[in-house]
Amino acid sequence: MEANREKYAADILSIKEAHDRIKPYIHRTPVLTSESLNSISGRSLFFKCECLQKGGAFKFRGACNAVLSLDAEQAAKGVVTHSSGNHAAALSLAAKIQGIPAYIVVPKGAPKCKVDNVIRYGGKVIWSEATMSSREEIASKVLQETGSVLIHPYNDGRIISGQGTIALELLEQIQEIDAIVVPISGGGLISGVALAAKSIKPSIRIIAAEPKGADDAAQSKVAGKIITLPVTNTIADGLRASLGDLTWPVVRDLVDDVVTLEECEIIEAMKMCYEILKVSVEPSGAIGLAAVLSNSFRNNPSCRDCKNIGIVLSGGNVDLGSLWDSFKSSK
């Protein structure tokens, strides 16, 4: 399906432009394979290791593109966002590279390792309550006080274009891929991947992986409109956001299916990433593998014929204490 910028917030041209813009700063992450996981799944799996990206997650691509897209006057005043996780660290790092300030509104209770990354990369942490209304209210106040530019974690064409560069690289690295499995939360990652991949290879299938405790995307696809959940409950802290008005049209039109996973399936997949692939992956990053190994995927007619599957390991920022507790609880 042809994707154009008149219909969506990004397109293959903006994604290619983003790749040219950010290429000097990002890692071209490797694609790993495992005969053991191929045997378990009955398919050929290709793991795009964004857990090895700068900042420990795919988010650096979009944040870097957004920062580098600012003109000199905008950049001088800095950037602001509200985020509990990897976007916060990614934007801090992108701003540091450009030598501009980054104001990061972080909700109380955010994972310590992700807050530590913000501080490590020079972001100015401003605490909020854990509610979205508090995050947005404080971010708005910072905007008024500083004149900085808001960089939304996912509902932004520059962010979507940056994340889409993952698919450009993956399809250059492994041409025979017939499906890509992508974690879904706010939809910035899967929107970029879908727009790029389906422009390059229209027959490719894009499958979203989502926790059952935060299954707003699955519900939205069924309802044909954005469904927002009042409460989410999942170990995958990076997959609790709701779809945005820029990401929803792409998810609605270009994402072929959504596979929802139990917590135990996510934890087991994370263990496999450590024990078999030998890479550090957070729960949100491991959910793509969980999807491919699930009965839901195996029995889904839209997934059954997918033999060469790309899986985006989206991030690797996890508190070691929480990781250990998760592994112990799964025994």
Curated annotation (Swiss-Prot):
Protein name, as recorded: Serine racemase
Residue positions binding ATP: 34, 54, 121, 278, 317
Binding residues annotated for pyridoxal 5'-phosphate, in chain numbering: 86, 186-188, 314
Pfam families: PALP
Binding site for Mg(2+) 1: 178
Binding site for Ca(2+) 2: 210, 214, 216
Family recorded in the similarity comment: Belongs to the serine/threonine dehydratase family.
Summary of activators and inhibitors of this protein: Inhibited by hydroxylamine. Racemase activity is enhanced by Ca(2+), Mg(2+), Mn(2+), and is decreased by Ni(2+), Zn(2+). Hydratase activity is enhanced by Ca(2+), Mg(2+), Mn(2+), Cu(2+), Fe(2+), Ni(2+).
GO biological process: D-serine metabolic process; L-serine metabolic process; serine family amino acid metabolic process
Residues carrying N6-(pyridoxal phosphate)lysine: 59
Phenotype upon loss of function: Deformations and branching of pollen tubes grown in pistils.
pH dependence: Optimum pH is 8.5 for racemization and 9.5 for dehydration.
Keyword Isomerase: yes
Lineage: Eukaryota, Viridiplantae, Streptophyta, Embryophyta, Tracheophyta
UniProt entry keywords in alphabetical sequence: Allosteric enzyme, ATP-binding, Calcium, Isomerase, Lyase, Magnesium, Manganese, Metal-binding, Nucleotide-binding, Pyridoxal phosphate
Catalytic residues (UniProt): 59 (proton acceptor), 84 (proton acceptor)
Tissues of expression: Expressed in the whole plant.
Reaction equations catalysed: L-serine = D-serine; L-serine = pyruvate + NH4(+); D-serine = pyruvate + NH4(+)
